[in-house]
Structures are given as C-alpha cells and as structure tokens.
C-alpha cells in the first residue's frame, strides 16, 4: 500500500489469540465499529473490519464511502465462512 498508513485499526467481532502478535507490532484493536467521525483527517489510516457481518448497517456503508473519501481512510472487509 502506497503511501503507507500511519495507523492500522483492526475492528473485530470476537477476540482471537492471533491478534496479540499484531498488537505488539502497533496495530490498534477495537471491538465493533469505530466512531470515525471523531478522527482527524490528517492521518492516513487503514481500517480492517473482521468478523463484523452482523454490523452491516449504515455505519459500514458510510465508512466505505464518505468516511474513506473525506477522512483519509482505506477500508478492508474480511469475510469468511
């Protein structure tokens, strides 16, 4: 990814032991969806949505559209069965 994000925020539905290594490497973890409207636009952020299929509401749509475009955010959505 270029330019490299200044922050990586991993949003999860259920904590997994594998997250501990990522946390040691500086990844920020939050349970559920973040309140991106509170974030400043001066940082490049990568937001990863993991295991949040039940959170498919208007906040997810805004994160992918207005949130990413106007707040300097790139979004990845991890979906697996």
What role is predicted for each listed range?
Residues 1-6, 11-17, 24-81:
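Conserved P-loop NTPase motor cores
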């Amino acid at each position: 990814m270029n330019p490299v994000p200044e922050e990586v925020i991993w949003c999860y539905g259920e904590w997994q032991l594998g997250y501990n290594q990522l946390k040691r490497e500086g990844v920020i973890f939050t349970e559920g969806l973040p309140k991106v409207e509170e974030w400043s636009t001066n940082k490049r952020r990568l937001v990863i949505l993991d295991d949040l299929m039940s959170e498919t509401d208007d906040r997810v749509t805004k994160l992918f559209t207005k949130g990413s475009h106007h707040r300097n955010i790139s979004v990845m959505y991890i979906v697996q069965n």
